């Protein structure tokens, strides 16, 4: 509209030019400067005139055209030219002539236009008045040139509009329209009168033409009219119709919309909208779809389009009705455009739409949906439903302001056409009205279920309806459960099993499960019926199904899995709710379904998954003693049901056991008494599940399922109530398990196995179940028991060998009758197992367990014993195995050697020696001379002598041991496969790793090196003690703790004592001087002894000792006077243990009590006789004359070794020299008569003399020195009751025989064994003295009758029978003993030895003769550096083996190890060699004769020299060393404080009900349950503390005066003692609020036993004990007299050492005392050892030693001290070190070897078989 203004300005310029007021418009053609005028000559004119021909004229016109375009013509030349050619325009002229003239006019106008003036009007007139309508194009070209394409109309203004209108009628072309556009733009004011006609004609052209170019140009004209002129109102309808139609042309959409937008922007905008609405509503246009579509488009775009006109104020509400009317006649195009338009409206202006607008929109949408029923247009259908979706999204966003009900009615009406999401929203909307506040809500729910569930095929919609139903049930089921289940659930979901959609079936089943879980009415059965129908579907794949479709088919069976898992959940809930019949039915349904699996052989993965989860749940069922069923919660706590039982009360619980079974099942706990009607109780017989489990074991093909069942069965079998209260056949279970292992096709039927699956994996899974079944052995047939053992034996060749060994160890305890037959073969099979770290602990602990079960191996022959040593010896290799394994191996070797039958032991010594050399010693050999020791094997390839020699002919009393050969060559070959040697490269490569494998903490390099060296020394010391142990026990079973007999006390009291250090032994010789005789006679011993007889007051001594291992056991022992009583606390490890005279420099007191230290002296302190108890003077005078006759020539030899002490009491029978003035020794018989006479005299005189000489003194206090004279102690003294028989025998203390309790009439023993008397006195036990009827005598070779008799002895000790031999033709007397009732565990204990223990030593025999003057003394090389000696007497002569030290000459024959054994006789033969000797004259003459030497009697040196002297001892280290002073005697006393047996202390605590987390309550318990009491009884023997002597019974620090209670339990075997710190037996003091008195004992024990009777889990850390408590052994009582053993270890504890006990899970053992004692004590022994090894790692420089090692180290330290003392006293003597036997090259610049290195080399090179010279 701004263009007319510019035109007005143009007119003003023109007027100015006309008036001369302005400048004319510059002619662009003159821009280049003034052109040269062209002159039209006459000739040119003549050529143009008619005179010339037409062709010449046309030619000349063409030339003039060129000139006119480019040059300026002279003035009036144009007129002349026009006049010359004007005649050619006549109509009759040819077209060429006319065209040439029009072309000339065009050229003149273009070239001379600015000079034409009025000629322009002339030329325009020529064109306008052209005679014909021809030549339109040329005329238009002249017009375009004349007006400059419509821009300049000077001199043409008046007639221009008429000419344009006239031209439009004749030639309305696009070219003209383009000129017209400029005319309208630049000269619109001259066209006003005719504009309406022009618009009309152009609109008609647009409507009629088909040329898009014409339409486009016409639109340009119309646009120019709208923009530069005013469109007439009368032209508006036609204009709009034209545009509405034109908009349908795709190419013209943009210009049409632009034109309409321009129109709507004018004052005619609202009129245009109105006209378009009228068009949409006009019925005459209902069929004109393009027109309606254009109108809809323009209205929508103008009002709410992307480029809407904000000047238009029409609201959507005003135009949408027109849209609705436009849809009166269904038309796809119009409807499509309407949908687009209102979609655009809704999306852009949704927030501004009012409710009335939404109503109209919903009307339009409804009509659209109706039209879709008739219009087959997918595009329209899609866009309409997209519109609905858009509205739906607004509803979701709360931006829909219309009627939601109206909208969802539309959606529901066309639900089948709506997408799932829309229906889901619809269902959600409908669900809002389903609640009790709405009338008819149940009917609405029914309609919803019927409409969208029963008749809906889309899963999502049906699932949504199920969600609505589930939500309704969840919210209001408690009020309307009855109506909902009746009216909706059952009616609508009963078809679920037949539904084709597996997802719907699955969710519907889950809904039924959820509903049934909380349903407690009769409707539960209806719901369960539907669930069972779902479960009844077959899980077998169709036969034609391909493998790739199995996954799809399995997915279609998910509803079955849901049903089964749902039943598991229902059962878990129903188990604890009423009615209990629901749980019973669910349980039966589950079992029935699983049975179908095995009946039809379902093998699909989903079927396996169902079985997997079903078994996973069902195997969690538990039962308590009241037969109530329960399940563990997520924390593992089992909650038992008050309504569901595992059996019926009327069920006969004993009916399960068949007649062929060994036992009937135990009665078990009492049945629960029903608290209500029987209908309230449900019965879930476990036998149903048990039968399914058997089917699983026999038929299951999926390995995951089978593995789960096998892993869960051991824990289920723990609850015996489940098994015994219903007919569950454990025989069948055992048979099924054994069949799995033996059947070759078991692996073939398994699938889903991991890669590399083999029979080993099957064994690994089955063996734990077999282990758990061991506790059911009383209910298994013997055949099944044998099958189990056989399967376990077969598993030894697989990776499960360790588990099998564990199980076999339990079988040994639980099933001795079965294992005893298989044991010989089993032991041989164990030798086939390679010695690996993984098998070390199981094998060694199995052997350790077996060693404590002598009744199992009482029939062992040498082959079996050799197998045991072949198994154990490789594990002594420190380069391969850790410290615990090595220590345990030495422990096993020692136990088995001691338990081995006596005749076999000698043959095993070289075998064990070579094994130790190969496995231990060579590991530390760093010398180049190793060729002699590179023995490939010390296994049974080089078997013991007893296995190599031929079997000797059987004789009655043969001295040769009964040795057997292998009966089969295959057995011999089996032994050859085991090698216990280590090759040189293995040693070199692994020694360093092994030595440093123990965790030494954060120590520096020096401490690490020290720890490594200590570890090396430890292994060498273990070897030394092992060899020393063999030397001690190879020919005898005497205990390691001798006790001086009353005769010895009498003879040796106040005697002279000297001690020599010989190798690693201390030899103490004590000779008699007559003090005992004078004391007997009432004489004053001070006459002979002077001041040396003084005895120190024990109360003045306070001693605190530390023994090895110097750990927790080191406690301060003090004697504190408290009023009238003395409180004595036992020292750890038996500090009060006295072996020999503690201070040998002080003679004995008359009462036989020397100064023994505070504790032992108090215990042995004799009562002082009353003052009036004096002998008559006459008798004293008469008997005094015979004092020298009674005591001369007696001597005691006490040998202290690392493994124990040995004592002999001997008499010198050499007559005195005729030149001597001394009187000969009194014969023993006369001495006995004198003693008996003195005894009778004292009885008549009523004098309580305190010297014990009567063998019947049962009430006498035990003697002070606990020595047992093992060879020649005359303890069986003559009494009148002995019928005058006198014999010489072994000490009663060491004859391991006791009276049999319960048969007092069979035998009577005249003399109580002193050691037994001492032990019984220490324990405070009552004894029965019985008299034997007969005496027996036998040689070392036992007869068959004796064998059979000894094999009947009670288990618990090594059967030993000691033969008694007399001189010459002395009549033989038989001494027989009857077996006894077992009282305790083991036979030959160092201190704690019971009657049964002593009895057990009857098995093997050895002849011991008295020492005669003709005794031959032979000496050979020793065991350990020539320092070990074995004393034995065979036949009728006594041989004393003395091992001197030092190297041998090269001329001697060499031993197998490259060194020649030394052998020479001291008394009869010349020395075999001469060796270098270091003179020590200064030392020998260090002192003059002392006062002790003036004491009458034989000098101890005389006795020592007769036994040990040799002219050639070799080097200095082999020479005996006399202890120089009293300080060293004190060291000997300290050695006596170290017991020769290992000691352990173990805590025992009782946890009652509700005490599992209360430390104070646990410690405050003063008693426990009856089962707890039975358990304590099985731990060991009850002892009374006040009657115990701490030096004889290890108490672990318990006070004997009542501070720590009155009683406790103790246990022992051959080489160890254990005491139990029992919290309930300790006093609970009110003043001790925190129970510190108890914790000071319990907190310092490595291992604690927790008897957990609380019914809850006991957690480690509940008892806040000290840092030393590593392991808890938790005993949980189970039903049917069974206990559960579990281990709890600290994170830093020795769990790894004892882990094999936990491999099968947990151990279930019978609560029988014998079984519990064996199981628990063996386990505790191993745990203690592992704990001690672990604890030593906290101090790497203090490696754990046994008591034997501690004694060995003490002796070695004593040797070093003596050498240092000698060197200090005699500086001229060199400091002696034991030299190495191997000579290093002289040129090698090596450092001087240390003492340890030299000792190590000497030990390696000198370990020989001492049995070669014995």
From Swiss-Prot:
A Pfam match is: Tuberin
Q: Show the ranges annotated as biased composition (Low complexity).
A: 1078-1097, 1448-1463
Phosphoserine (modified residue): where?
540, 664, 939, 981, 1130, 1132, 1155, 1339-1340, 1348, 1365, 1388, 1412, 1419, 1421, 1455, 1772, 1805-1806
Q: Which InterPro entries match?
A: ARM-type_fold, Rap/Ran-GAP_sf, Rap/Ran_GAP_dom, Tuberin, Tuberin-type_domain, Tuberin/Ral-act_asu, Tuberin_N
State the signal peptide span.
Answer: none
Which tissues express it?
A: Widely expressed.
**Domain of life of the organism encoding this protein:** Eukaryota
Which residue numbers delimit the Rap-GAP domain? 1532-1766
Q: Does the keyword Phosphoprotein apply?
A: yes
Region Disordered: which residues?
A: 1078-1174, 1325-1356, 1428-1490, 1772-1798
What is one GO cellular-component annotation here?
cytoplasm
Record's keyword annotation contains Cytoplasm: yes
User: What are the GO BP annotations of this UniProt entry?
Assistant: anoikis; B cell proliferation; cell population proliferation; cell projection organization; cellular response to insulin stimulus; cellular response to starvation; D-glucose import; excitatory chemical synaptic transmission
* MF-aspect GO terms: 14-3-3 protein binding; GTPase activator activity; phosphatase binding
- How does this chain sit within the bilayer? Peripheral membrane protein
Q: Which residues carry this modification: Phosphothreonine?
A: 927, 1270, 1465
Q: Which keywords label this protein?
A: Cytoplasm, GTPase activation, Lysosome, Membrane, Phosphoprotein, Tumor suppressor, Ubl conjugation
* Function as written in the Swiss-Prot or TrEMBL entry: Catalytic component of the TSC-TBC complex, a multiprotein complex that acts as a negative regulator of the canonical mTORC1 complex, an evolutionarily conserved central nutrient sensor that stimulates anabolic reactions and macromolecule biosynthesis to promote cellular biomass generation and growth. Within the TSC-TBC complex, TSC2 acts as a GTPase-activating protein (GAP) for the small GTPase RHEB, a direct activator of the protein kinase activity of mTORC1.
Assembly with partners or alone: Component of the TSC-TBC complex (also named Rhebulator complex), composed of 2 molecules of TSC1, 2 molecules of TSC2 and 1 molecule of TBC1D7. Probably forms a complex composed of chaperones HSP90 and HSP70, co-chaperones STIP1/HOP, CDC37, PPP5C, PTGES3/p23, TSC1 and client protein TSC2. Probably forms a complex composed of chaperones HSP90 and HSP70, co-chaperones CDC37, PPP5C, TSC1 and client protein TSC2, CDK4, AKT, RAF1 and NR3C1; this complex does not contain co-chaperones STIP1/HOP and PTGES3/p23.
- This chain's protein is named Tuberin
Q: Which organism is it from?
A: Mus musculus (Mouse)
Report the gene name: Tsc2
